[in-house]
Amino acid sequence: MTSAIFLAMLCLGMALPSPAPDPILDVEWQKWKIKYGKAYSLEEEGQKRAVWEDNMKKIKLHNGENGLGKHGFTMEMNAFGDMTLEEFRKVMIEIPVPTVKKGKSVQKRLSVNLPKFINWKKRGYVTPVQTQGRCNSCWAFSVTGAIEGQMFRKTGQLIPLSVQNLVDCSRPQGNWGCYLGNTYLALHYVMENGGLESEATYPYEEKDGSCRYSPENSTANITGFEFVPKNEDALMNAVASIGPISVAIDARHASFLFYKRGIYYEPNCSSCVVTHSMLLVGYGFTGRESDGRKYWLVKNSMGTQWGNKGYMKISRDKGNHCGIATYALYPRV
């Protein structure tokens, strides 16, 4: 094809033909579509198959290199296999990090006797992993998770709280529902509203809706919230002494999208820009402590088939890797 014809096709909005599919992957492609309920038009099929094959090649290349000791984690094909990185990054919008005035963040005296391992999930503070689906509601899952942990600490009862309540009702505070939200503004809503419903009375719908909060169904409330100073020592102190912490990371990478298990380290991660909210539920290390394979344990909201049953380990003490300590806060109840 000449360059002139190529340019003409672009100007006319014509799609270039997809590359021929690899017949060796036919069975795997069909199994993947069935597993994740994928169905395409004839036109879409070739395009999506090409994207899927490209992602599959990247995953196999990464895992091959991991077997040679180049990486510390594996990747796996999942429900996002038909997404290009460009499409994924359109969803991973940069989260504005509030400027915290002096005296507004918590700076407790750092303990020298912190536990070497913390896992609040094992202690009953964490509800099951959910799937945010088509709604960009990671911020709401992060906030409900942090409140659930503190309510369990206070009452001994672990009650799943309503993500949809936050999606529908925190617009007056500045959130944008399924388009974009901020954990700080979501906590402001709960505090100003005087309560938050449970998942049982206000279930998740994966879409924006009108606010239908009912005070009589309020299940949890907060008295305020605190920012954690932007360093990993303070974050370690907070998660050890307080419980699950709302955090955000830079998740704009294929390595994140197809993460499976191991300690995640992405050389291209930013320590300043964060795009995806998660729930920090612990920390630890693998092997011997002197080996330096330290990690943060975080809960995601992309379902149990993502990562290690919905969880991820992120490199700890590696220069605030992926911005794990850049935007951390927790509620007071």
UniProtKB/Swiss-Prot annotation:
Primary location recorded for the protein, binned into one broad class: other
Active-site residues from the entry: C138, H276, N300
GO cellular component terms, A-Z: lysosome
Keywords: Disulfide bond, Glycoprotein, Hydrolase, Lysosome, Protease, Signal, Thiol protease, Zymogen
Domain of life: Eukaryota
Residues of this chain annotated as glycosylated in UniProt: N217, N221, N268
InterPro entries named in the record: Papain-like_cys_pep_sf, Pept_his_AS, Peptidase_C1A, Peptidase_C1A_C, Peptidase_C1A_papain-like, Prot_inhib_I29
Entry's EC annotation: 3.4.22.-
PROSITE patterns xrefs: THIOL_PROTEASE_HIS
Molecular function terms from GO: cysteine-type peptidase activity
Database matches in SMART domains: Inhibitor_I29, Pept_C1
Tissue: Placenta.
Disulfide bond positions: C135-C178, C169-C211, C269-C322
Annotated propeptide span(s): 16-113
The keyword Transmembrane is annotated on this UniProt entry: no
Location(s), subcellular: Lysosome
Any Gene Ontology biological process: proteolysis
Gene3D superfamilies noted in UniProt: Cysteine proteinases (3.90.70.10)
Signal peptide bounds: 1-15
Family, similarity comment: Belongs to the peptidase C1 family.
Full protein name: Cathepsin M
Organism of this sequence: Mus musculus
Record gene name: Ctsm
